[in-house]
């Protein structure tokens, strides 16, 4: 039976989604998502899940609510499919989730709501502002600053008399009205207030002010949505509680383009330093089935050497060997050559040791290693991608080489995502990543800080017309992390 889940993704930091919300992302067949979610969450989807972007920016949207409702209905009517409506914050806190749930109910569609952390609470926390404090505020009240018909019509006299913390969402276009109405209704003009812009994100900004100066603060600092506006004595604790302001990489958003399985060490480093990042897999890697390659695997004893130049090559080579039931004990006489520590460790995960490891992550270094250590005239097995340069194969003219394309790189299945128009730090681990990213996001590359893993990737980037900001001295993941460390030292 089909079902729709309305899931809150939290205020922006991907780590703030609930366990159940993440589980449903991993199960969903259709994901209908908004602008303010963290896009890394979409990397958790099934490989065949279909994405629909229906985001709104301010009060503008290419999707009307009626159209979103109809899309939900269309997906939900697919028998046996799970539809996920992924919304920023909590789906029922000014998120139109209740409207969508009622619409589905009217049309006989089963739905379930998974709460999320609202920016009205989580956003304040990241700004160092508690919603309550027993000495100064025993309650909090959340309001929308904008309705479908314009500025929210509220009982200002009642609001001005309320004890506790007043929190306004979606209010940036009406700050002057809100502050003037509250002051006119008797609220103390010197009451503390604060704005938290893009709460929990790398470019979060916090501005401390007072009720009477809030509009001027908003104008002088060009504060826009998404922002939380808070009024109350709890603001006095902001500097003492703030844990987010001292980030060494604030304002920076790093884009990683490798398969997410290969990014864990890089992600851990960025998370430890409270840096924001996006994982965008613009390239899909799929196996190429070749009868001749299968015959080579079944006759593996015939080879003296095996060349594995990438982590993908390791994965597809050993997966195919396992699928064919090849007994790994038959590899006893084979010497394995690889590039880099990560590729070596992937080989070890299958129970093998790399005999020759090129520490520099370049094919030239690999060629030097092979030609100086391989016995000439012997049989060599060289599985590689369909995009592999021909230089390694060409350098092996003195050997009896069987080279096979065992996997292909393709960006045909990639669905372009909405990315903010800003300066990103983009890390390219291969030429194919650069070529693919340029196909989808050339406007972002024009002003990005571009990092390259090595000289071949740098040449490809420059051939596309872009300048490389930094190239890794060590051509592997650790070398790329070192470039981030340089940025931290520079910022400090």
Sequence positions of predicted segments:
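Short beta-strand/turn micro-motifs composed of small residues
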Residues: 33, 87, 115, 144, ...
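Structural motif
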Residues: 3-6, 29-30, 49-52, 81-85, ...
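Class I SAM-dependent methyltransferase SAM-binding "motif I" and its flanking Rossmann-like core
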Residues: 13, 90-162, 207, 356-362
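Conserved anion/nucleotide-ligand pocket segment
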Residues: 147-194
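A short alpha->loop->secondary-structure connector
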Residues: 105-108, 131-133, 184-190, 324-330, ...
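Class I S-adenosyl-L-methionine
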Residues: 1-14, 19-117, 122, 220, ...
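A glycine-rich beta-strand to alpha-helix segment
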Residues: 69-125, 164-179, 191, 379-401, ...
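Signature of uroporphyrinogen-III synthase
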Residues: 5, 11-12, 49, 58-79, ...
């Amino acid at each position: 039976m089909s079902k729709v889940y309305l899931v809150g993704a939290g205020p922006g930091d991907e780590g703030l989604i609930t366990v159940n919300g993440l589980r449903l992302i991993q199960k969903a067949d259709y994901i209908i998502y908004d602008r303010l979610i963290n896009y890394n969450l979409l990397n958790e989807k099934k490989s065949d899940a279909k994405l629909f972007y229906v985001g709104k920016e301010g009060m503008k949207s290419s999707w009307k609510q009626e159209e979103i409702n109809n899309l939900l209905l269309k997906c939900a009517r697919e028998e046996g499919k799970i539809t996920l409506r992924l919304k920023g914050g909590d789906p029922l806190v000014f998120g139109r989730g209740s409207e969508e749930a009622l619409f589905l109910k009217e049309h006989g569609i089963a739905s379930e709501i998974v709460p999320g952390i609202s920016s009205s609470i989580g956003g304040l926390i990241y700004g160092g502002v508690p919603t309550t404090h027993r000495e100064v505020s025993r309650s909090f009240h959340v309001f929308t600053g904008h309705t479908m018909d314009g500025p929210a019509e509220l009982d200002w006299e009642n609001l001005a008399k309320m004890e506790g913390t007043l929190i306004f969402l979606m209010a940036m276009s009406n700050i002057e009205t809100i502050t003037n109405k509250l002051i006119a209704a008797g609220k103390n003009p010197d009451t503390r207030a604060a704005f938290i812009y893009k709460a929990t994100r790398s470019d979060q900004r916090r501005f401390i002010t007072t009720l009477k100066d809030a509009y001027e603060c908003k104008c002088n600092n060009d504060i826009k949505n998404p922002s939380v506006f808070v009024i109350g004595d709890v603001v006095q604790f902001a500097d003492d509680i703030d844990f987010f302001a001292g980030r060494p990489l604030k304002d920076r958003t790093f884009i990683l383009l490798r398969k997410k399985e290969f990014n864990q060490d890089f992600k851990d480093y960025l998370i430890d330093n409270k840096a924001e990042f996006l994982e965008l897999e613009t390239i899909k890697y799929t196996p190429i089935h070749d009868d001749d390659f299968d015959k080579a695997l079944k006759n593996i004893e015939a080879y003296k050497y095996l060349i594995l130049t990438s982590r993908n090559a390791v994965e597809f080579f050993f997966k195919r060997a396992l699928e064919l039931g090849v007994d790994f004990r038959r590899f006893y006489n084979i010497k394995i050559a690889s590039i880099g520590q990560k590729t070596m460790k992937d080989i070890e995960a299958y129970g093998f040791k790399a005999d020759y490891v090129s520490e520099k992550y370049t094919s030239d270094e690999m060629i030097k290693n092979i030609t100086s250590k391989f016995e000439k005239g012997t049989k060599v097995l060289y599985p590689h991608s369909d995009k592999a340069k021909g230089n390694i194969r060409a350098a092996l003219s003195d050997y009896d080489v069987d080279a096979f394309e065992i996997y292909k790189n393709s960006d045909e299945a990639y669905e372009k995502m909405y990315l903010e128009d800003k300066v990103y730090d983009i890390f390219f681990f291969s030429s194919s990543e650069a070529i693919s990213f340029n196909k989808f996001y050339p406007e972002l590359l024009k002003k990005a800080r571009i990092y390259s893993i090595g000289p071949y990737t740098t040449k490809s980037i420059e051939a596309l017309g872009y300048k490389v900001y930094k190239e890794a001295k060590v051509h592997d993941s650790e070398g790329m992390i070192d470039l981030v460390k340089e940025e931290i030292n520079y910022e400090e």
